[in-house]
């Protein structure tokens, strides 16, 4: 008896209803024209890591917990004396999510993390880049349930970029709205 592989809830929803809805809305002829989620990039810039190397490692550990895969520590390429920054110092961390982990992260972001934000009124509908990608900033990474509020020493902000295969911002907005992204009216 063959076991069925796990498929994330949002992926099933995309295959069953979202794809057909977008095809009808934009009149696509080919199935491959329909926009889909490509990747999600999480980035955390740690300015305090210039003075303390352990902060970058702690942030990378927290980002790994949030993403479900190992975070990559990013290093400075050039020295900037104004910021007391030397070359090859840790300044942040990032993770790129694709496939199943991407859908799981978006599901947790929309349904768990964003409702926990204080005074949340919706996402800015103008944060598209012109090429079908959407970026949003999170002020505190402790809104994710994976991070224990009591054990977290500091709270850092993070950038979330959702990359899609959409050609225009309108197509990307329709795709993300179908995934229940809470855009402001």
Curated annotation (Swiss-Prot):
- Judging by the UniProt lineage, the source's domain of life is Bacteria
Q: What does the record give as the function of this protein?
A: This is one of the proteins that bind and probably mediate the attachment of the 5S RNA into the large ribosomal subunit, where it forms part of the central protuberance. In the 70S ribosome it contacts protein S13 of the 30S subunit (bridge B1b), connecting the 2 subunits; this bridge is implicated in subunit movement. Contacts the P site tRNA; the 5S rRNA and some of its associated proteins might help stabilize positioning of ribosome-bound tRNAs.
UniProt source species: Nitrobacter hamburgensis (strain DSM 10229 / NCIMB 13809 / X14)
**Subunit details:** Part of the 50S ribosomal subunit; part of the 5S rRNA/L5/L18/L25 subcomplex. Contacts the 5S rRNA and the P site tRNA. Forms a bridge to the 30S subunit in the 70S ribosome.
Mind telling me which NCBIfam families this protein's record contains? PRK00010.1
Any Gene Ontology biological process: translation
Q: What's this protein's family per the entry? A: Belongs to the universal ribosomal protein uL5 family.
Quote one Gene Ontology molecular function term: rRNA binding
The keyword Ribosomal protein is annotated on this UniProt entry = yes
Name of the protein: Large ribosomal subunit protein uL5
Q: Name one Pfam family in it.
A: Ribosomal_L5
Instruction: Output a single Gene Ontology CC term carried by this record.
Output: ribonucleoprotein complex
PANTHER family annotated for this entry?
A: 60S RIBOSOMAL PROTEIN L11-RELATED
Query: Which PROSITE patterns does this chain map to?
Result: RIBOSOMAL_L5
Name the UniProt key words of this record, in alphabetical order: Ribonucleoprotein, Ribosomal protein, RNA-binding, rRNA-binding, tRNA-binding
């Amino acid at each position: 008896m063959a076991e069925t592989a796990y498929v994330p809830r949002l992926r099933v929803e995309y295959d069953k209803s979202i794809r057909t809805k977008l095809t009808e809305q934009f009149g696509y002829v080919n199935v491959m024209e329909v926009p889909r989620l490509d990747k999600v990039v999480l980035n955390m810039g740690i300015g305090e890591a210039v003075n303390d190397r352990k902060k970058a490692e702690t942030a990378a550990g927290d980002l790994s917990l949030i993403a479900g895969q190992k975070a990559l520590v990013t290093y400075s390429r050039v020295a900037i004396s104004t910021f007391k920054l030397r070359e090859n110092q840790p300044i942040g961390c990032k993770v790129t999510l694709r496939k199943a982990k991407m859908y799981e992260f978006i599901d947790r972001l929309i349904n768990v993390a964003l409702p926990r934000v204080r005074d949340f009124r919706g996402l800015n509908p103008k944060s598209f880049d012109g090429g079908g990608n959407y970026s949003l900033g999170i002020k505190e990474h402790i809104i994710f349930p994976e991070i224990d509020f009591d054990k977290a020493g500091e709270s850092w902000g993070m950038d979330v970029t959702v990359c899609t295969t959409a050609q225009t911002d309108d197509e990307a907005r329709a795709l993300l709205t179908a995934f229940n992204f809470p855009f402001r009216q």
